[in-house]
C-alpha cells in the first residue's frame, strides 16, 4: 500500500514517513515488516518500519537492497523523550558521511564492525514534539552493509559511557533517509 506522510501500523509493525514537503518520494508498506521507497530530486525525507515504542535492548534484523545516489542513510533510527534525543545507528550511507564536521567521542565494536560515535545538536528543528532544540546521537558503521542484525544495547551502552543518555523510548525503526538525492530501497525488518 502506497501512502502519504504520516505514522501508523502495517501488518503488526509501526511505520513512520516524514518529508519536508519538497521530497519526490513514493513510500509503500509491504507484507510483514517490509517496505519500499523510491525517491528522486528529493528534499529531505525519513521513512521506515519498526516498533512503537522501541526498547533499549532489541536485536533488530534487516535485509534487502539499498541503492542511493547522493546523500542518504540506512539506519536504525528513533527518538527518546526526557531528554529529547534523535538517534541513528547508521549501517550504510551514500556519498555523504553524516558525521562530517562532528566531533568523534569514541567507538564501539558490534555485529562485525567498528562504529564511530558522535554527538551533534539541532537548533529549532522538527522533532516528535514539534520544533525544538535537541541532541542527535550517532553510531556510524565503518563496514557498510544493507542486511544484518543490530544489537542496539551495545550502542546505547557505549553512548552512555560517553555521557550520551537516552530517556523514555519513543518509536524505533529501520529507516531510509534522503536529502536532495535519488535512489531506491526495499527493506524487510524483524
Curated annotation (Swiss-Prot):
Disulfide bonds: none annotated. Keywords: Carbohydrate metabolism, Glycosidase, Hydrolase, Polysaccharide degradation, Xylan degradation. It catalyses: Endohydrolysis of (1->4)-beta-D-xylosidic linkages in xylans. One of its GO terms (biological process) is xylan catabolic process. Coiled coil: none annotated. It comes from Trichoderma harzianum (Hypocrea lixii). Pathway: Glycan degradation; xylan degradation. InterPro entries: ConA-like_dom_sf, GH11/12, GH11_AS_1, GH11_AS_2, GH11_dom, Glyco_hydro_11. PANTHER family: ENDO-1,4-BETA-XYLANASE, ENDO-1,4-BETA-XYLANASE A-RELATED. Belongs to the glycosyl hydrolase 11 (cellulase G) family. The active site is at residues 86, 177. Its EC number is 3.2.1.8. Residues 1-190 form the GH11 domain. This is Endo-1,4-beta-xylanase. One of its GO terms (molecular function) is endo-1,4-beta-xylanase activity.
Amino acid at each position: 500500500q502506497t501512502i502519504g506522510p504520516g505514522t501508523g501500523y502495517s501488518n503488526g509493525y509501526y511505520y513512520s514517513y516524514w518529508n519536508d514537503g519538497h521530497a519526490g518520494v513514493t513510500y509503500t508498506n509491504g507484507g510483514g515488516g517490509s517496505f519500499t521507497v523510491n525517491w528522486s530530486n528529493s528534499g529531505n525525507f525519513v521513512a521506515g518500519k519498526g516498533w512503537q515504542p522501541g526498547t533499549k535492548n532489541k536485536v533488530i534484523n534487516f535485509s534487502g537492497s539499498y541503492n542511493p545516489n547522493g546523500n542518504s542513510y540506512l539506519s536504525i533510527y528513533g527518538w527518546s523523550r526526557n531528554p529529547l534525543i534523535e538517534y541513528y545507528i547508521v549501517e550504510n550511507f551514500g556519498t555523504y558521511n553524516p558525521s562530517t564536521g562532528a566531533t568523534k567521542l569514541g567507538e564501539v565494536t558490534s555485529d562485525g564492525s567498528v562504529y564511530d560515535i558522535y554527538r551533534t545538536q539541532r537548533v529549532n528543528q522538527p522533532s516528535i514534539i514539534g520544533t525544538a532544540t535537541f541532541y542527535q546521537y550517532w553510531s556510524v558503521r565503518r563496514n557498510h552493509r544493507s542486511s544484518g542484525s543490530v544489537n542496539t544495547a551495545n550502542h546505547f551502552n557505549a553512548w552512555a559511557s560517553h555521557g550520551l543518555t537516552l530517556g523514555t523510548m519513543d518509536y524505533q525503526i529501520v529507516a531510509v533517509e534522503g536529502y536532495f538525492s535519488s535512489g531506491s530501497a526495499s527493506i524487510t525488518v524483524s
